[in-house]
Amino acid sequence: MEKLQKMTSEKSLVIFSKNSCCMSHTIKTLFLDLGVNPTIYELDEINRGKEIEQALAQLGCSPTVPVVFIGGQLVGGANQVMSLHLNRSLIPMLKRVGALWL
């Protein structure tokens, strides 16, 4: 859990993802299309990916990918991110943490 805290607090936007997950691809594409440069951890490619996935599950993330942290705070998965985007809360949130300047 401490490793997860360190990974998410050092960058303004962190996405935990898997290459094989279509929803992960959708969320990554959304942020890239907005002009944000997220830090992306592909859990199926990195060392200790399974361990990190278990830590995400302990935080209540289900499914465990994609999971988004903005400004070190857990936002949630694809449903939460898309809801924020549709109600126009996502961009102000990204601006507040310095992940988006325009």
Curated annotation (Swiss-Prot):
The keyword Ribosomal protein does not apply. A motif (Responsive for interaction with TGA factors) lies at residues 99-102. The keyword Iron-sulfur applies. Residues 1-101 form the Glutaredoxin domain. GO terms for cellular component: cytoplasm; nucleus. It comes from the Eukaryota. One of its GO terms (molecular function) is 2 iron, 2 sulfur cluster binding. PANTHER family: GLUTAREDOXIN. This is Monothiol glutaredoxin-S7.
